[in-house]
Amino acid sequence: MQVKILDTTLRDGEQTPGVSLSVEQKVMIAEALDNLGVDIIEAGTAIASEGDFQAIKEISQRGLNAEICSFARIKREDIDAAADAGAESIFMVAPSSDIHINAKFPGKDRDYVIEKSVEAIEYAKERGLIVEFGAEDASRADLDFVIQLFKRAEEAKADRITFADTVGVLSPEKMEEIVRKIKAKVKLPLAIHCHDDFGLATANTIFGIKAGAEEFHGTINGLGERAGNAAIEEVVIALEYLYGIKTKIKKERLYNTSKLVEKLSRVVVPPNKPIVGDNAFTHESGIHTSALFRDAKSYEPISPEVVGRKRVIVLGKHAGRASVEAIMNELGYKATPEQMKEILARIKEIGDKGKRVTDADVRTIIETVLQIKREKKVKLEDLAIFSGKNVMPMASVKLKIDGQERIEAAVGLGPVDAAINAIRRAIKEFADIKLVSYHVDAITGGTDALVDVVVQLKKDNKIVTARGARTDIIMASVEAFIEGINMLF
């Protein structure tokens, strides 16, 4: 059995509070979704705005493998806009619960909804569109009416139907029961559309598929209004590894797609989010990592490479000998039992103070205890920042790289960005360093607060973390960045 996926990141996902995507950004995400292997891309609502119309039009002209879809109401103008934008299909919804019918069609009854739905489906078919017809708020509706609505949609030649748990009130058991009843009465392919208001979107989607639904709706990273939609990455992995149900998704592209959506939507993925969160394949505890080095399956349900990730071992107050030895082997160092005891004690001391232990911290501790003096390849000699009102921030930097002086300048969106860009220009002949993440905290209060900057840098397949702490956020950022560079050289 292979399940179809309708990705609604560009429609329902964009309804996440604070998210607004440009046409260019929507095209970028659509191309990534197509490369990922989703079957249907709901690219927006053609009638909603000129931007949505243009996005659907642009995406439809890209020659993607996925079916390009527009959201629509049971209104001719919505259908016309979708067809004029070049969409192949529409996901057209009609209110099915009395709550929604009364709110959207005051004074009208269920028969009116059926009549208008049939008219809209027939008109959409005349316009040459594939029609996926959805019952909105179906989980709070009379199920007999929902089935009646679906049967009339089938008679009107709709291509697919969707049961929408619009406010996320179903339990997995109830979803399974409902899907079985619908499949017994209606022969059209059935999709399910779940929201996460009670944290059950993934479970409800899985139970719906188990019961016979052939398609599910979801978003990358679980984006969506309120608590979000079913997260595609979670559903796909759970279906395949727990139930043996396949999709067309290229799983190794899940992480990169997640990071692209995170970057363009500016909605940060929680670190503990399954599959794509920073901590999903990160290990610290000494006992756990010791077992992990012997057999990765001991504390991982799947290999991180399956979803395009790498296993990360971090050190902190729970660090054990195995973790430290792994890092020392990578550095080519060896320690006596007494030295190892001292290294572990110092690492735990930092963790006990509530601080994150970075790779640079660990290396410094190891080299201090082993009395190894390492000459840093990259040193900051001078830094100048120019910024002000109506002035594009610019930075000039002087570095010594292996004893050779390099001077570069660059602009940026802010002074920190300008400084980092200048450093990257200075080292570009030596290495292509990518900034993976940037995090800043104020350690003390007041305008003279000490700030703690932690950066994550990547070179090839190696990722390191480094810290800088100053009262000047620019200097703290530069210090962290250069410390990380020295870890990668």
UniProtKB/Swiss-Prot annotation:
Q: Which reaction does it catalyse?
A: pyruvate + acetyl-CoA + H2O = (3R)-citramalate + CoA + H(+)
Instruction: Tell me its EC number(s), please.
Output: 2.3.3.21
Q: In which pathway does it act?
A: Amino-acid biosynthesis; L-isoleucine biosynthesis; 2-oxobutanoate from pyruvate: step 1/3
Q: Which UniProt keywords apply?
A: Amino-acid biosynthesis, Branched-chain amino acid biosynthesis, Isoleucine biosynthesis, Transferase
* GO molecular function terms noted in the UniProt entry: (R)-citramalate synthase activity; 2-isopropylmalate synthase activity
* Pyruvate carboxyltransferase domain ranges (all copies): 3-255
Root EC class: transferase
What positions belong to coiled-coil segments?
none
What CDD domains does its record include? Answer: DRE_TIM_IPMS
Its GO biological process terms?
isoleucine biosynthetic process; L-leucine biosynthetic process
Q: Which SMART domains is this protein grouped with?
A: LeuA_dimer (SM00917)
- What this chain does, per the record? Catalyzes the condensation of pyruvate and acetyl-coenzyme A to form (R)-citramalate.
User: What does the subunit section of this Swiss-Prot or TrEMBL entry state?
Assistant: Homodimer.
Q: Which NCBIfam families match?
A: LEU1_arch (TIGR02090), PRK00915.1-2 (NF002085)
According to its UniProt record, which protein family does this protein belong to?
A: Belongs to the alpha-IPM synthase/homocitrate synthase family.
Q: What is this protein called?
A: Putative (R)-citramalate synthase CimA
> What gene is this protein translated from?
cimA
